[in-house]
Amino acid sequence: MSNPELEVYSVKEVAEILKTSRQQVRKMILAEELPAVKVGREWRMAAEHLQDFILNTIE
């Protein structure tokens, strides 16, 4: 079962989008401010969750 429309971002990509450091993104993930899942040794975030985070932050 796969969804070709499901887009995910790495910590590096999220950091670039949010204009912050990878370390800050990891801190936000561990503080459960950003929803993410760990795949192997790497964190991944669904594009939909990142969009929700951005929209909720600016409101």
Where are these regions (language model features)?
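Major-groove DNA-recognition helix of helix-turn-helix-type DNA-binding domains
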Residues: L18-R44
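The alpha-helix within a helix-turn-helix
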Residues: A15
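A short, Lys/Arg-enriched interface patch at domain edges and termini
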Residues: M1, L50-E59
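Residues within the helices of the helix-turn-helix
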Residues: V11-K12, V37
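A detector for short, charged/polar N-terminal pre-domain segments
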Residues: M1-E7
